[in-house]
Every structure is written in structure tokens, then in C-alpha cells.
């Protein structure tokens, strides 16, 4: 990798670590068949990616955004937020629904004393040992 190329890129992308991430991402894009925007001149993909960044044929901000999207497992979709009045109305409807449900939907849990718990634990059988695990 030519030092001149790296020095030219540092002017465009201040952080060297970010530069490495962006150039690596762009080099992977090139290896997957993305069209290059500069002459190859028998250079390898990372050098071509750095030359593209140095020549500003690609925007570092666009590359950064594309890198972020490629690393996300779940891409968020910006949806318009509900107005505060709609949220208040929905909260009131939920509260009314809970009040109407009343005592019928109350969930009860069985209680167990400490002695009953210990007796239950003592009654458990240990699993057989297996050589595979």
C-alpha cells in the first residue's frame, strides 16, 4: 500500500481507524463486483479503495452509511411518531380496558413453603453421566 495514498486519504477521513474500516468495506465491495471509479493500474482492491477515497470519487459519508447498514442485523425503518394527544388517548383506552376486565382475569400463584421446596429438591434424580459430554 503506497504511503502517498494513505497520506492523501487522511485529509479526507480524519480518523485512521475509520479510514481502515471504510477502505476495507469498499475493497470488499470491489471484490464482489462493484464498479471502480478510478483506473486500476494493476493495483489490488484495498489500494484502489484508498485511491477512490483520496480522489474523492466516493463520498466518505456515503461509504460510512453503507458500512453501517451492512453491519446491522435489523435495519430500522423511520416511521412517523404518534402525536402526544394520540398517545394519551391510547393510554386512556388501555386503562379503561383493564378496569373493565375486573377481578375475572386475576392470576394467582401457588405458594410453597421452604420445607416443601427442600423436599421437592431432594426428590430429584441426577441425570446419568455421559462420556460424550
From Swiss-Prot:
Coiled-coil positions: none
Keywords carried by this UniProt record: DNA-directed RNA polymerase, Nucleotidyltransferase, Transcription, Transferase
Listed GO MF terms: DNA binding; DNA-directed RNA polymerase activity
Pfam families per the UniProt record, alphabetical: RNA_pol_Rpb6 (PF01192)
Keyword Nucleotidyltransferase assigned: yes
Biological role stated in the UniProt entry: Promotes RNA polymerase assembly. Latches the N- and C-terminal regions of the beta' subunit thereby facilitating its interaction with the beta and alpha subunits.
Name of the featured protein: DNA-directed RNA polymerase subunit omega
Amino acid at each position: 500500500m503506497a504511503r502517498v495514498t494513505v497520506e492523501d486519504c487522511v485529509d479526507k477521513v480524519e480518523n485512521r481507524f475509520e479510514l481502515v474500516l471504510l477502505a476495507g468495506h469498499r475493497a470488499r465491495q470491489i471484490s464482489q463486483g462493484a464498479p471502480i471509479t478510478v483506473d486500476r493500474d494493476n493495483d489490488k482492491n484495498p489500494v484502489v479503495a484508498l485511491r477512490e477515497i483520496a480522489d474523492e470519487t466516493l463520498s466518505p459519508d456515503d461509504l460510512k452509511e453503507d458500512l453501517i447498514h451492512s453491519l446491522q442485523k435489523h435495519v430500522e425503518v423511520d416511521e412517523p411518531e404518534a402525536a402526544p394527544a394520540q398517545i394519551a388517548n391510547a393510554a386512556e383506552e388501555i386503562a379503561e380496558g383493564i378496569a373493565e376486565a375486573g377481578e375475572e382475569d386475576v392470576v394467582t400463584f401457588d405458594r410453597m413453603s421452604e420445607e416443601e421446596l427442600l423436599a421437592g429438591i431432594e426428590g430429584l434424580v441426577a441425570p446419568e453421566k455421559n462420556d460424550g459430554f
